[in-house]
Amino acid sequence: MDRLLVLVRHGQSEWNLQNLFTGWKDPDLTDLGVSEAKAAGRALKTAGVGFDIGFTSDLLRAQRTMKLLLAEFGQPDLQVTKNVSLNERDYGDLSGLNKAEAAQQWGDEQVHLWRRSYDVPPPGGESLKDTVARVLPYYCQEILPAVLNGKRTLVTAHGNSLRALIMVLDKLTPKTIPGMELATGVPIVYRLKADSTVESKQVLEP
């Protein structure tokens, strides 16, 4: 049985380009982001994988990445479930600010702490720990059972919601996970064992 799970961070968004804290705000993809999503589809096609089910967030940039990827891949009619549990970390009062504006208001050290600590949330927002607590129940209840039942599964989501999944899959600690960077539009291909641990992992660089 092929227990396939593929994770893809959405292509570059307009706010990624402007270096803004995005969180639950809903900007579209840039032209580069569109190209990245299509390139991810081509990379997966070249790798010879197929899909039975997809999961994405409640936000446009992840949904559009899924749609563009699947069109390029040749499975435009794949069943895809959208759920807010896979949304990006909520940056609260930082949302819509660029990194320099945030530093002016709260100081470099404080903003760095909010961005890179595991359990310190920005005002009105979520810490990475909060994001993990939101994402993992959905993974355990919906995504993982599909994978273990042999459904080849594609997830398009966000840097921090995918960090939550990778933390479990790669057995990373709260100390190591905040500093892990995820490139936009690059598929990470996991194959799982029957006990849900990782059998193999491959990053499909464009």
Swiss-Prot record:
Active site per database record: 10, 88
Assigned keywords, A-Z: Gluconeogenesis, Glycolysis, Isomerase
Family matches, as PANTHER family: PHOSPHOGLYCERATE MUTASE
Domain of life, source organism: Bacteria
EC number: 5.4.2.11
This protein's record includes keyword Membrane: no
The reaction(s) this protein catalyses: (2R)-2-phosphoglycerate = (2R)-3-phosphoglycerate
Name this protein carries in UniProt: 2,3-bisphosphoglycerate-dependent phosphoglycerate mutase
Gene Ontology biological-process annotations: gluconeogenesis; glycolytic process
Gene3D superfamilies assigned to the protein according to its UniProt record, in alphabetical order: Phosphoglycerate mutase-like
Marked site: Transition state stabilizer: 158
CDD domains: HP_PGM_like (cd07067)
Subunit structure and binding partners: Homodimer.
An MF annotation (GO) of this entry: phosphoglycerate mutase activity
NCBIfam families per UniProt: pgm_1 (TIGR01258), PRK01295.1 (NF002339)
Protein's job: Catalyzes the interconversion of 2-phosphoglycerate and 3-phosphoglycerate.
Pathway in which this enzyme or protein is active: Carbohydrate degradation; glycolysis; pyruvate from D-glyceraldehyde 3-phosphate: step 3/5
Family of this protein: Belongs to the phosphoglycerate mutase family. BPG-dependent PGAM subfamily.
